[in-house]
Regions:
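C-terminal secondary-structure termini that scaffold catalytic or DNA-interacting sites
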Residues: 58, 71, 76-86, 93-95, ...
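The DNA-recognition helices of helix-turn-helix-type DNA-binding domains
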Residues: 53, 106, 160, 182, ...
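DNA/chromatin major-groove-contacting recognition/catalytic segments
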Residues: 72-77, 168, 189, 193-212
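Basic, Lys/Arg- and aromatic-enriched nucleic-acid-binding interface segment
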Residues: 1-49, 57, 86, 94, ...
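Short functional hotspots where side chains directly engage DNA or cofactors
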Residues: 58-63, 153, 164, 176-194, ...
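Generic beta-structure capping elements
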Residues: 64-66, 94, 126, 157
Length: 212
């Protein structure tokens, strides 16, 4: 299977720094892109997220549905195709802090927002209405070009999330769980080249075993 275009650890840091320096006038764009990079969710899962799926207190994102588009059906929602795609993903502090600001942005437009969180999607335009499912991909491409980053697609952000976790020695079973893969074999097949070289550890272990 061919390798995917991803950000390296350093590139991801620089990309996040760029996002964090964007004006709060585009907080909706920043949040959507950071959600894909920092939780590994698919584009359809991003557009299916509602505020009732966000647990800021426990720093958990609940992935429960996809919001997709096709010529035959137009824009529609569906449950993930596998049970493992229904998952809870931990969120880092930086993302949680941004989501708190984002929630205030919604409250500015609707004083009854807290009572209607199941009605509001996270991937929205400035009017707080749901974005067309392909919009974030176009925004991402424009930002990368404007600020001199290589092109990494929405799915590439998901691959980046996975590769960064693996390179930081997060257990493959844990990575597979948060990616929503059916089992860790799928994760290994696609991302094995990101696993850190453990040759020295293997030699050290074998030397200990073979000592007399």
């Amino acid at each position: 299977m061919p390798e995917k275009e991803v950000f390296s650890f350093r590139e991801a840091q620089e990309f996040l720094e760029m996002l964090d320096n964007l004006s709060d006038d585009t907080i909706n764009q920043r949040i959507c892109i950071k959600l894909m990079l920092l939780t590994g969710i698919r584009n359809g899962e991003l557009h299916g997220l509602r505020w009732s799926d966000v647990d800021l207190k426990n720093r958990i994102l609940h992935v429960r549905r996809n919001r997709l588009v096709s010529r035959e059906f137009g824009i529609y929602e569906k449950c993930p195709k596998t049970k493992t795609s229904l998952r809870d993903i931990p969120m880092p502090d930086n993302l949680v802090d941004d989501l708190k600001k984002y929630k205030e942005w919604f409250r500015l437009a609707d004083e009854h927002f807290d009572e209607k969180q199941d009605e509001y999607y996270l991937a929205v335009g400035l009017d707080r209405q749901p974005l067309y499912p392909h919009t974030i991909a176009h925004i991402l491409t424009k930002l990368e070009a404007k600020y001199g980053f290589k092109h990494v697609s929405c799915h590439g952000l998901r691959h980046t999330y996975c590769s960064l976790l693996i390179s930081q020695n997060v257990p493959i079973q844990t990575v597979s769980k948060y990616m929503g893969h059916s089992d860790s074999t799928v994760t290994l097949e696609v991302y094995s080249h990101f696993i850190p070289d453990t040759q020295e550890k293997v030699v050290f272990a074998l030397n200990n075993i073979s000592k007399k």
